[in-house]
Amino acid sequence: MSNYETMKDRMSSHFLEYDQEKMIRKFALEHDEKYLYIFFVERKYRINRITGEITWSVDKFQTEENANYNEAMTIYDVLCNSKEYCHPAHEWVHIGSLSTVQGGNLANDSNFFRDAGKKFDGKTAELAKACERLHGIKMEKGDVAYQLELFSFLPVVLRFWESDDEFPASLQVLVDRNILEYMHYETVMFAIGHLLERVGEEMERFMQE
């Protein structure tokens, strides 16, 4: 078993130590006796209330897949560790400006964003279509810009500029100023990584049609 799987299993056990009824009230979660349900980047997940295991489905759980590390760790962190009175500020900030940490992988000029920008370069139509498939709301500025739901209670903005003769492709992510009330700084990396993965999946589907 990989270190990632070990950590995920540890967190599933950790999840069971928390008050699930409080989670339900806090985030208005759909639930039944066996599961809690939550949407994460327009995909429905369920958390087993006895084992803590997280799975997702696109067919109302007739079939299901295990959540990967980024997905599971983000959901666990939000449900278990968000501040009691977390709330959106309704004010966008650059993800690299999160106040508690300077630099790191979420800095605007990090390899993380440069590499993602390269993948989108020359594919603005596909990127826009992917954002629309994820029910994004079109925004101003940038060659492509959309507000997307990370969670129903926590949107983000994806903004992209294509490369030209003077500048490389540029990807910018804006988050709510209070995002760290919902998750740890390190978890933001997992969440945005999953967001970009979902956008990439929808781009691939569009190009294959």
Could you say what each language-model-derived stretch is?
Residues 4, 18, 35-37, 45, ...:
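Sequence-level detector for tyrosine residue identity
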Residues 102-103, 107-112, 141-142, 180-183, ...:
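Domain-length accessory/inserted modules outside core catalytic folds
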Residues 64-89, 176-209:
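Ampiphathic alpha-helical segments that act as solvent-exposed interaction surfaces
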Residues 23-51, 137-162:
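Amphipathic, interaction-prone secondary-structure segments
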Residues 1-34, 78-134:
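Short Lys/Arg-enriched alpha/beta "domain-start" segment
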Residues 44-73, 161-186:
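Intrinsically disordered, low-complexity regulatory segments enriched in Ser/Thr/Pro
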Residues 8-11, 62, 69, 85, ...:
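Short linear sequence motifs
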Residues 121-181:
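Conserved binding-pocket/active-site segment within a compact domain
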